[in-house]
């Protein structure tokens, strides 16, 4: 087995141990692509994977609006209460951090390894729940900027 395949198998095991089915599934799909000699599709997956993932994430978030589960009164309530305003601010901050995470992942794709290992550590030892690499990268980008500011760099 080649190094790439071994790493993918390792990520599958880590994903299973760390209760992160998305990591395990993604590694399984990529391993299947490699083993089925479909590696010619890897550049396309790399180039468009984040966009497709964000599209499906956005679709799932918007389903309550399309299905009518969210009514106009809930939309108005979001602007009339403190929890509603805090939710709006939280959503805006999360979107900003995700954008910074996307920028960081585009600049340094190898950062995913640290994000995956850090996420697994948090899941196992801090009783956290799996989050996407985008949010983890966003937090990393903010921490990186803070570190640079504090170190004078």
From Swiss-Prot:
Main localisation: membrane
Cell location: Cell membrane
Key words of the record: Cell membrane, Membrane, Transmembrane, Transmembrane helix
Residue spans crossing the bilayer: 6-26, 50-70, 75-95, 111-131, 132-152
Membrane topology type: Multi-pass membrane protein
One GO CC term on file: plasma membrane
InterPro entries recorded: UPF0756_TM (IPR007382)
Family assignment from sequence similarity: Belongs to the UPF0756 family.
Record protein name field: UPF0756 membrane protein Pjdr2_2290
